[in-house]
């Protein structure tokens, strides 16, 4: 009887551990992106989403970032305007990812994808 109780306790513990480890944090949620301005000038961004919408984020100060915003998954075009010059970056956004679109001091753009799971 004792071995049966131990087995049942072990089985329940194993089942609980397995269920917790297999839980995904993200349930096919839309991607989210933000602009990080590590440059020396204010930056404004126009975002053309994969579903045809256009979003503007204006005057992101140097040393700051915008908040994350959700977009439809797919190819998204970011046009950054710094001192009247346009810089473009096209990014394939996937569900369950955050994206950091960063501008460096030379106005180079880098993209980092962060898995939400």
Predicted feature residues:
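Asparagine-centered strand-capping/turn motif at beta-strand->loop junctions
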Residues: 33-39
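Bacterial lipoprotein signal-peptidase II cleavage site
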Residues: 23-30
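Short, ordered, surface-exposed loop/turn motifs in non-cytosolic proteins
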Residues: 40-51
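Short strand-edge motifs at loop-to-beta-strand transitions and within beta-strands
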Residues: 64-66, 99
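Short Pro-Gly-centered beta-turn/loop motif in secreted/extracellular proteins
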Residues: 66-77
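Short beta-strand segments within Ig-like beta-sandwich modules, predominantly Fibronectin type-III
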Residues: 56-61, 91-93
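Sec-dependent bacterial lipoprotein signal peptides
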Residues: 1-23
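Structured interaction patches on ligand/partner-binding surfaces of diverse proteins
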Residues: 83-110
């Amino acid at each position: 009887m004792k071995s049966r109780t131990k087995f049942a306790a072990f089985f329940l513990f194993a089942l609980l551990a397995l269920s917790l480890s297999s839980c995904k944090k993200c349930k096919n949620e839309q991607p989210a992106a933000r602009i990080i301005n590590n440059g020396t000038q204010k930056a404004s961004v126009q975002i053309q989403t994969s579903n045809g919408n256009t979003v503007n984020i204006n005057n992101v100060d140097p040393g700051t970032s915008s908040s994350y915003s959700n977009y439809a998954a797919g190819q998204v075009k970011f046009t950054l305007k710094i001192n009247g010059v346009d810089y473009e970056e096209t990014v394939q956004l996937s569900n369950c990812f955050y994206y950091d679109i960063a501008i460096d001091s030379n106005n180079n753009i880098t993209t980092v994808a962060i898995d939400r799971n």
